[in-house]
Amino acid sequence: MRPEIKPSGQKGRSFIEEARRAQIIAAAIEVIADLGFARASLARIAERAGISKGVISYHFTGKNELMEEVVNQVYTSIADHVIVRMDGVGTATGLLRTHILSVTEHMRGNRTQLKALGEIFSNLRTDDGQPRYGIHTNEELYRSLEAIYRLGQESGEFRRFDVRVMAITHSSAIDNMFAYWIVHPDHDLDAHARELADLFERAVS
């Protein structure tokens, strides 16, 4: 994550500044989910937030930085939720299942965030035209999932397998579950997650 630096160049932010940034990020999520990435201009986001475009420019250097902060904040909220659910789980099998179910639980209650993430991941580009997000930005996630699978192998709960392959498959399965749910909102997301957890439990034993 980027350094916490105010537009003035001073480190740290006041409570009011943090609240304003949160307001802008929340408005950005709504506009992106409703209108799509291309139509989510800073002017529209400012209008949704009930502020001037200049206020956004004070807190963010431009649309790209705001989009990156949306991703940072959403992923932080997911991680916070999952960590609470996984706290105290004593087995690798339990951690595996809890990870899948807790991520699902969080996103079920935050569908708008999920739609916004999908738009950003599909459209945000770096200055040289390359996708900002993708497999190349998933390393931290893969390593955290590998830790669960490695723990299971060390404890004897899981059979031997390539933990990187399993981590990639695990992540992809969750991503595709959510992608299907966005297109088919009546799909039973919780049932899908339970089936997925069952599938991975069988795959590692």
What function would you assign to each model-found segment?
Residues 24-32, 103, 200:
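Short hydrophobic clusters on alpha-helical segments that form packing/core surfaces
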Residues 1-19:
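N-terminal intrinsically disordered/low-complexity leader segments
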Residues 105-109, 147, 151-154, 160, ...:
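Amphipathic C-terminal alpha-helical segment
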Residues 104-147, 154:
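Short secondary-structure transition hinges
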Residues 20-29, 45, 66, 70-74, ...:
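Generic hydrophobic, amphipathic alpha-helix propensity
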Residues 23, 31-65, 69:
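Helix-turn-helix
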Residues 69, 83-113, 166-170, 193:
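Hydrophobic alpha-helical connector segments
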Residues 94, 132-138, 153-169, 190-191:
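All-alpha amphipathic helical-bundle segments outside canonical DNA-binding/catalytic cores
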